[in-house]
Every structure is written in C-alpha cells, then in structure tokens.
Amino acid sequence: MTILEHEIMMTEQLRRVPADELQARLNKFRAVMDREFPGWEIAIVNHKVNMYYFAGTMQDGVLVIRPQDEILWVRRSYERACNESLLQDIRPMKSFRTLAEFYQPLPAKVYLENKTATLEWQQLLYKYLPFASEAGMDSVISELRLIKSPYELALMRKSGSIHRNVLDELAPRFIVQGVSEAELAVNLYAEMLRRGSHGVARFNLPLGEDVVGLASFGKSGLVKTAFDGPGGTGGTCVAVQSIGSAFRKLQAGRLVYLDIPCGVDGYHTDKTVVYYYGDLDQDPFSDKIRAAYEHCVFLEELTASLLQPGMVIENIYRQVMEQFDPQYENGFMNGGKFLGHSIGLVMDEAPALANGFKGKLEAGMVFAVEPKIALPGIGMVGTENTYLVTAGGAKSLTGKPQPLRCIL
C-alpha cells in the first residue's frame, strides 16, 4: 500500500528503506572518508540510529564498512535484520570473535563513533580485534545526515502533516476544564499514533529521553529540566522530567504549552503550540502575554526568512538577536543561547542555530526554529515549527506560527 509520494517499498506491515537509498549513503560515506581520512581501511558502526541510516534496521550487532564492501553482522535478531534491511550482505555473529576470524589481516586503525561508543563496548571490541589505534568518524556521519534526500524529506513531510493536523487543528477539542497535563499530552500523542507517527522521540544527548512530549499549564512551564531545551515541566515525578503531571488540572486563566514530538519511520519533526484557556481579555497580564507571544512569532518568521543556502549559521543567529527585544533577555529560551536546531533521525541533530557555528546552509537541510519566552509568575509562551532549506528559501513542514488562540 503506497502511503508516501516517493517510491518506497511499503506495505501496511513493513516499510523498508530502499536499497538505492542505502547504497547512496554508503557511497557518500566512503567519499567523505576518503577526503577526511585518506587511506582508511575499516569503520565500525554500532549506534542503532547510525545503523538504521546505513543499513535500514536496528539490531544488536555492527555494520562494518570498508572501501571495498560493507557487511551487517547481527547477533540479534538476524532473522529480523534479513527481513528489514535491503543490504546485500547480512551475516550472523555470536561475538566479536566472529569478526576477528573474518577480518584478517587486521587493519592497523579503526574508525568508530566516539560520541556513543561506551568504554565497555570498546574494551570488548579490542579484546578480539586489537587495532593499533582508533579515531572518531562522528563528524563524517553528521555531515551526511545533515543533508536530507528526497526519501527522507518525504517521511518528514508526512510527519509534519501529522504534527500540523494534531497540534493546530485537533488540540483545542482536548483542552477542557479539569484535564490534567499528563492526560492532555497522552491524548495528543495517541492522535499522532493513529495517524502514523512512529511513537518515540530520539535524541543525541543522554538526558534526552522522551516519548509523549510534554504539556504544561501556567507556571509549570517555567520549571526547568536537565535537558538543554527551553520548554519546562514538573514532569510526572522527580524521576521523569517530561509528559506533565497527572495531578495538575487545567483551570481558566492558564497558558497551555504543548510540545509533543512526531516522526515517521525514524524521521522527526518538531513543533510547539501555545493556547490560552479562558478569556485572555480578562487576564491582568493579557498585554504582557500577547506582546511576548507576538515577539516569538516575529522571531520565528525572521529566522525562517534567513534560512537560505549560503547563509552562515552564526550570522543568522546574530541578525535575529539584533532585532530581539532586550526586555525578554532573562526569560528568553529559559536561559538557552540558541534559536533552533537541525533535526532528522534525532530531535537534536547538529548544528544548532547559535553563535559559534560557522558552517553555511545548503538546500536539503532541515531546522526546527523555536523562539520561546518564560514569563515569571505566568508561564511559557513561544512558537516552533520545522523548516526545510530550499533554493527558494525556507519551506515549513509543520505549518506556520498561529496567533495566540483562546479556548473558551
């Protein structure tokens, strides 16, 4: 059953990453490795997201890439890997001993994912494969993942369509007197699942664990979390800094902050909406709330207008911040120093839209733009949408920022 416009092997039960897509990624990987590390001989991919990127499956095993070949070695589940991946060479492994017997003579240097490979994993690897030296290849993989292919963009457009439908169109019907933060978040999450969302939000950062996202009412949106993001929540408990409280019920006169992630077949979009429950005109802080929210809309639209090929990332940040109203300095991004971030297989892809990032934008990059302002004693306001960089400027995948809507 075809669901996306792109030609993908797709059924209701199983959607595989096309073989030509995987091969194109592997070819680009080899080209960048040749450029950055001339004479390289072997690279080992262990992280499940990178394995999915290159092999189209997430298993307990490793993908070994050499200039002349690539082999997916799987401990568990070999059968599932063979069903999901369209790589030509997939083999079972019991341990790294299997690889030690195959890769002889052993190259002197191996390239690994240093950002995610644990010391324990590396020690186990070196027990059977005693490479003389190692180096990181994280920058190579990040460079490849930054530019999205037509296949990847088809998935992100589908995710963005779900995101826009649920948060812009359906959310108001669930914002009712007495609903809890947790219940509202879960209801919206369920609506996304019903429409095809893959149901999790993956992050690079270790503290980024999320499934449902979060809903915050009023001042609970000001509670900072350990995760490096502007949105706040008290969480379900001390141990879980997301979703929202099952005991904080919605009352009139509260801001409703919704940051519920969405994704399709591994590819995410990011979107945040804010509603006001009640009659904003009767709120003593109505002018302050409206002004701060409208400034966030202005900042998002300004940032999006600068997302053009050739623009230097840090210059975008500086140009936008030149138009930033200093009265919001203490509450902007809840202390963060960025305007947004790249997004794709994880929510927090590099680079961020921030100072210090000197790379230039290219068509095919995708960024979430999320200006947000914390209003002490009131709550969090802001907007967020996901934008594709094209030759003709930025195109939103999740809709445009909407005026602050009141739910009466």
Predicted regions and their residues:
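Active-site neighborhoods and metal-handling regions in enzymes and metal-associated proteins
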Residues: 1-408
